[in-house]
Amino acid sequence: MVFIVTVLVGIAVHIATGNFFTSYNISTLSRAASFAIIVGFGQTIVLLTGGIDLSVATVGQVCGMASAIFMVNYGMNPYLAIIIASLMGIALGAVNGFFIAYFKMTPFIVTLATMQIYKGIVYVITKGMPITGMPENAQNLA
């Protein structure tokens, strides 16, 4: 149903503006929506199994911060930094899974707590400041 409504809105906007379905616009929309789509697939699995994960965006923040630090402070190859940051994301998700599975804790409580912990980690490490000076080849990946 959501897909049908999305297509209908796209058609209506194209009729109104005449330039919605251009290759540039489709490419831009695809890049902008890719993170939400990937997270949506993962969250669908979590919700279908009766759980909820509130820490997804915060895990993304930790991983993004880590990859930026690896590239800016240590001059690491962007692809390697992204792979290491992705492995960190898997490890942080495994922490949630460990507490939920082995201690039989409620997923809502565990992920709410780890979300706050991960936010604190990002804040302490970055001191609330953005990480600047990303290499040019890393900016093209975004």
What are these language model-derived features?
Residues G75-M115:
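Alpha-helical transmembrane segments within multi-pass membrane transporters and channels
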Residues I45-L48, N77-I82, Y102-T106, T126-E136:
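A cytosolic-side transmembrane-helix exit/cap motif
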Residues P107-A142:
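Transmembrane helix-bundle core of multi-pass membrane transporters
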Residues V7-Y74, F98-M105:
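Single transmembrane alpha-helix segments in multi-pass membrane proteins
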Residues F3-A12, F41-G42, V62, I83-V95, ...:
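Generic alpha-helical transmembrane segments of integral inner-membrane proteins
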Residues M1-V5, S27, R31, L80-I84:
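Alpha-helical transmembrane segments of integral membrane proteins
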Residues V2, F20, G60, T111, ...:
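Electropositive phosphate-/nucleotide-binding environments in soluble metabolic enzymes
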